[in-house]
């Protein structure tokens, strides 16, 4: 007779925790309503929600959710991509780094192997850029990377092969100019994201501007494309609605540097060691108040001619990037600094900047080149 203590007792089955009644009822709603509800929540809650059930996990990584956030205006600028080029024994190597809320105030190598392109632009969660041909030759192909779904795509080729073109975005349309032969009828063209078609636009009146690399940067202010060219050329403005070119004001060009960006239809630039904004009504540059504090961190460089300063629209805030040698005197490395500035206009019309934080975000060899910053919303 087997002793009672040796008899195996049947093990009780462990019950999986059931979903709360409220959650079960919530999941009975159509996906369209679920997506609309999730789109109104902060992305900071998405990680916890993804643990609730498979349905949430699937919806939280879907394109319809991003589209709903975009339409509701609840997308968040949460990542700054920087492309840097480093000298190696064989050939220069371009690498992307990211500065996000998750990484804090430190640049980390990007998880995405994005190609470098001077014409890289963002539209929502998608990054668009031109494919570089063999040996960095001209190309008409365009790649897309969706940071929300982490997927790649393509669009129809441009009508003109380009190299180091300039691009900007206005009303779901991508405008590309330059980087090609000045004799081409498609020197300036527009891509409509909705119709997936390219259309040629009127070329710049100045043939010299249309030669390679004479367009430094373009961006949009009040429905017009502002074109910054080389120092020896005239700057231009293209009125999108009228399809007309006009020369930029001489005083505007006088202090308009290559370090500039547009935030809420206001142009900001860094020139003559000051941060400025352009008053369209008064047709003059004004200084952004409250940023003299930054001079102590940026003016100590002993190589001002080669010092980098970049301005980026980071979700309505001004992200300022600059470099300086790691130590005074001889140094083989440079520190890349970043300052995040909140902007406010006072009753007298002056714009004030408040530095929310600043820090060294990366240390790099002094031989590096800063190529491109872009901000992405997800």
UniProtKB/Swiss-Prot annotation:
Keywords associated with the record: Kelch repeat, Repeat
Q: Boundaries of each F-box domain copy? A: 23-69
Report any Pfam family annotated for this entry.
F-box
Positions of Kelch repeats? 124-172, 173-218, 220-259, 260-305
Please list which residues make up the signal peptide.
none
Against CDD domains, the record matches this protein to: F-box_AtAFR-like (cd22152)
Q: Which SMART domains does UniProt cross-reference here?
A: FBOX (SM00256), Kelch (SM00612)
Lineage, top-rank taxon, reads Eukaryota
InterPro entries registered for this protein in UniProt: F-box-like_dom_sf, F-box/kelch-repeat_ARATH, F-box_dom, Kelch-typ_b-propeller, Kelch_1
Q: What is this protein called?
A: F-box/kelch-repeat protein At4g29370
What is the originating organism of this protein? Answer: Arabidopsis thaliana
């Amino acid at each position: 007779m087997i002793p009672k203590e040796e008899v195996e007792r049947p093990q009780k089955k462990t019950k999986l925790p059931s979903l709360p009644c409220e959650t079960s009822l919530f999941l009975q709603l159509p996906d369209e309503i679920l997506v609309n509800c999730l789109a109104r929540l902060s992305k900071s809650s998405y990680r916890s929600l993804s643990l609730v059930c498979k349905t949430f996990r699937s919806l939280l990584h879907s394109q319809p959710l991003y589209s709903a956030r975009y339409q509701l205006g609840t997308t968040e600028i949460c990542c700054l991509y920087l492309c840097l080029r480093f000298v190696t024994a064989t050939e220069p190597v371009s690498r992307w780094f990211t500065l996000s809320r998750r990484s804090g105030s430190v640049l980390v190598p990007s998880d995405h192997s994005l190609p470098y392109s001077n014409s890289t632009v963002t539209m929502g969660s998608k990054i668009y850029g031109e494919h570089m041909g063999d040996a960095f030759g001209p190309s008409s192909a365009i790649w897309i990377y969706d940071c929300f779904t982490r997927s790649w795509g393509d669009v129809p080729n441009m009508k003109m092969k380009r190299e180091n073109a300039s691009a900007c975005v206005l009303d779901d349309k991508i405008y590309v100019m330059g980087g090609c032969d000045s004799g081409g009828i498609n020197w300036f063209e527009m891509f409509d994201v909705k119709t997936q078609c390219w259309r040629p636009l009127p070329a710049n009146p100045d043939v010299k501007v249309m030669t390679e690399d004479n367009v430094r940067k373009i961006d949009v202010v009040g429905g017009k494309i502002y074109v910054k060219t080389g120092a020896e050329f005239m700057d231009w403005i293209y009125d999108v609605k009228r399809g007309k070119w006009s020369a930029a004001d001489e005083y505007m060009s006088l202090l308009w540097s290559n370090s500039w960006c547009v935030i809420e239809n206001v142009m900001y630039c860094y020139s003559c060691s000051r941060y400025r904004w352009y008053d369209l009504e008064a047709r003059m540059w004004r200084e952004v108040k409250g940023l003299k504090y930054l001079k102590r961190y940026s003016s100590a460089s002993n190589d001002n001619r080669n010092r980098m300063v970049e301005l980026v629209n980071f979700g309505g805030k001004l992200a300022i990037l600059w470099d300086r040698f790691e130590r005074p005197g001889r140094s083989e490395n440079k520190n890349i600094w970043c300052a995040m500035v909140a902007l406010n206009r006072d009753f007298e019309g002056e714009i004030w900047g408040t530095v929310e934080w600043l820090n060294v975000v990366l240390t790099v060899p002094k031989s590096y080149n800063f190529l491109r910053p872009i901000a992405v919303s997800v």
